[in-house]
């Protein structure tokens, strides 16, 4: 198991500058709670007593996923600081309690339980990998609590207890495959980390390729965080001797080794263009621009999105954390999540009654850095679709952008088992999965 950080509490208040004061109260780890909660008891949390409203932040601050998740925490804390500076929520300041999931899925479940049972938070912003989300999902459903999940994922899920502010497959994976088929070739080698997101994503990609005249020539996986990539690169060269598309769903530190050795093996983007769905500006910076220049990524947001709302977001982030920092899609989705929660709480006129907050969240809109987004009845966002190419400066040149926000489709329509299904939490009779045809 990866090393765990001690519990930390961040009480974030606004100050006279953009700058905020962050009062850090470091505490030793508490013993695991043995409190049990009935499936409906969390409908009223009682976590907003006094002058503060407690929320949880649960991401990997250590282990292989820290390369990606630390920056998401920064974005969530920035949103909280902005809200507190502007007067808070319902006249109260937000108190954020931060926990480290340590890139270990049982730890995520343990920390989610602690945040709900011991810290009595009103909601949690957290997770990155689908494995961590799947680990905490039973906790949120059994305790009838609320998670805001900020990362693109494989779909095939629609929980009452989760709001998904990252992309569904039809807002990232599917349009990127279409773009590759039109612009880069028909033969695909699929490489991913060995857990639920890459395997489910590749199931979708294979079904889409079959439906649209593409061909999957190879598929291989690495344990999450593994840097033993030589065998996979050899397989790619054998399966695509004359070049072809590499579709990459690796996560964490594996990407560092993969792209360095890919270049070392002579598999450059001119003949072997890769499309990644978990590499954004932060990862490009960590891996090195020289290794990623000319490769592609599909997201809803890039730092290079042109517009005043994004400029304000980027400028604020750099002012708070340093001019050398970059923004990326999961950070933007996490930032959106905090504001959508705030708006839902204000509409519901309570942070504690989670049923009212859930109902109030549906239909909320937000002028996000990517463009205006809407929280649909299926607990997913209507979002813009973009594809970017890594440039010399480590940022993405946008080569494709949708004209408008694309409605989310959680249940994939290329996969036979879920074709014709949808989700609608505004109607209890429909709920998380119902047949439309």
Features from the language model and the residues they span:
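N-terminal export signals
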Residues: 8-28
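Bacterial lipoprotein signal-peptidase II cleavage site
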Residues: 27-37
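Extracytoplasmic "Venus flytrap"
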Residues: 56-75, 99-106, 128, 194-199, ...
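Beta-alpha junction/loop-to-helix N-cap segments that form part of ligand/metal-binding clefts
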Residues: 67-72, 86-156, 165, 222-226
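Extracellular/periplasmic Venus flytrap/periplasmic-binding protein
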Residues: 110, 154-155, 160-265, 304-312
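Periplasmic-binding protein-like
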Residues: 115, 119-127, 148-150, 189-192, ...
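Extracellular/periplasmic periplasmic-binding protein-like sensory domains
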Residues: 262-335, 346-352, 402-436
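Solvent-exposed, acidic/polar segments of extracytosolic/periplasmic ligand-binding ectodomains
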Residues: 362, 368-437
């Amino acid at each position: 198991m990866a090393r765990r950080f001690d519990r930390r509490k961040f009480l974030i208040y606004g100050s006279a500058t953009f700058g905020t004061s962050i009062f850090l109260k470091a505490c030793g780890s508490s013993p695991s709670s043995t409190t049990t909660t009935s499936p409906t008891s969390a409908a009223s949390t009682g976590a907003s007593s006094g002058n503060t409203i407690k929320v949880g932040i649960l991401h990997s601050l250590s282990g292989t996923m820290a390369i990606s998740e630390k920056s998401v925490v920064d974005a969530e804390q920035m949103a909280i600081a902005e809200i507190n500076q502007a007067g808070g929520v319902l006249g109260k300041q937000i108190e954020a309690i931060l926990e480290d999931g340590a890139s270990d899925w049982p730890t995520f479940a343990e920390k989610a339980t602690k945040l709900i049972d011991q810290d009595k938070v009103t909601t949690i912003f957290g997770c990155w990998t689908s494995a961590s989300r799947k680990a905490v999902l039973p906790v949120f459903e059994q305790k009838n609590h609320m998670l805001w999940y900020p990362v693109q994922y494989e779909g095939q899920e629609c929980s009452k207890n989760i709001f998904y502010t990252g992309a569904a497959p039809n807002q990232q994976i599917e349009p990127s495959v279409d773009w590759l088929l039109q612009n880069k070739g028909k033969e695909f080698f699929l490489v991913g980390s060995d857990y639920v997101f890459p395997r489910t994503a590749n199931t979708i990609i294979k079904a889409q390729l079959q439906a649209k005249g593409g061909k999957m020539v190879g598929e291989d996986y690495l344990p999450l965080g593994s840097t033993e990539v030589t065998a996979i690169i050899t397989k790619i060269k054998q399966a695509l001797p004359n070049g072809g598309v590499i579709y990459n769903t690796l996560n964490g530190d594996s990407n560092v080794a993969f792209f360095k050795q890919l270049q070392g093996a002579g598999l450059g983007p001119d003949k072997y263009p890769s499309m990644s769905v978990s590499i954004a500006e932060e990862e490009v910076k960590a891996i090195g621009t020289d290794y990623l220049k000319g490769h592609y990524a599909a997201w809803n947001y890039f730092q290079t999105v042109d517009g005043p709302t994004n400029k304000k977001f980027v400028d604020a982030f750099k002012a708070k954390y340093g001019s050398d920092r970059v923004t990326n899609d999961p950070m933007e989705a996490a930032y959106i999540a905090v504001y959508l929660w705030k708006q839902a709480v204000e509409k519901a006129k309570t942070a504690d009654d989670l049923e009212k907050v859930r109902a109030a969240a549906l239909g909320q809109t937000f002028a996000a850095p990517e463009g205006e987004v809407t929280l649909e009845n299926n607990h997913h966002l209507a979002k813009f679709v973009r594809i970017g190419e890594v440039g010399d400066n480590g940022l993405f040149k946008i080569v494709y952008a949708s004209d408008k926000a694309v409605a989310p489709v959680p249940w994939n329509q290329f996969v036979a088992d879920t074709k014709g299904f949808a989700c609608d939490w505004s109607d209890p009779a429909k709920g998380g999965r119902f047949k439309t045809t």
